[in-house]
Amino acid sequence: EQEPNNTFYVLDLSENPDDIDGDCIVCDQYVQESLIYIQKDLIEWNKTYYWKVIAYNNNNESNIIGTSSFNTASPITNTTTNVYENNFQEGLTIFGSFFDYYSAVIDEGGNEIWNSGDQDLIFYNTDKYGRFFGAEFIGNNEENNYPGIKFSFENGIEWQEPGTNFIHHDIFQLPNGNYIGLGTSNNQGVIPLGPWTPLFQALGYEADGETIEFNWMGDKIIEWDAETKEEIWSWDVFNYFNMEDYDSLGGIWFEAYNTGRFDWTHANAIWFDEDDSAIYLSSRHLNRITKISYP
């Protein structure tokens, strides 16, 4: 915190609480125009650091702020990084690991510089304002155990939807302040004829392309009120797509034999066009992008 009537500050940082000046790793660091100092190279994981700041006023009189300390946690990723200097761009890379329940940030050199720690936060996407969106894993005992969230480095979870659906791939904040996400929906459908037919018939299904007997999983776009978290608008593929249009070539019905449900649409992105008041839905298993009128 800034001290009044001071013109500049000098920072010392050490791992030795008894001799911060003499055993410093950041020594006599001059800080004037900003109260922010970013050290990119000398801070390591699993360490305790001690710091003090000397504030100087216009008369060159000093006042010591501190001593204080902070801890760094443990790294969470276990990766090997190959750096191609001619190809990389400046900046940081944030990613989420869905089945390991964490998010992390790496710098240009592949060094892990932040992670979600003991919060099981999974990064999905960001927006032009730099806000982060994703999901939180809340345990296997919940029916919908990945509620969609907005989160930040500083505060962790800042908003969370009510958890009445499985929110996957995409969630973000609309210009009106509400949140919109990509969930799932289910309906009963046929098992169409194909090379998988004997497999399903061996399980006791008719599998004749006519009998409504098998679980189809589709996608549902959901908008929540930012304050009440009430679902105020939705769009479901089962209300608009023809179930006779499905992928018969990609092996999805063989996967359905093992999982007990047909992954019909498998959407992996939604995008909002404010100028056109429209939502674009990318349905991977239908090889289709759909433009949807938004109220």
Predicted regions and their residues:
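Conserved aromatic anchor
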Residues: 1-4
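Recognizes extended acidic, P/S/T-rich segments that occur
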Residues: 6-46, 58-66
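Histidine-/acidic-rich catalytic cores in large beta-rich domains
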Residues: 57, 67-295
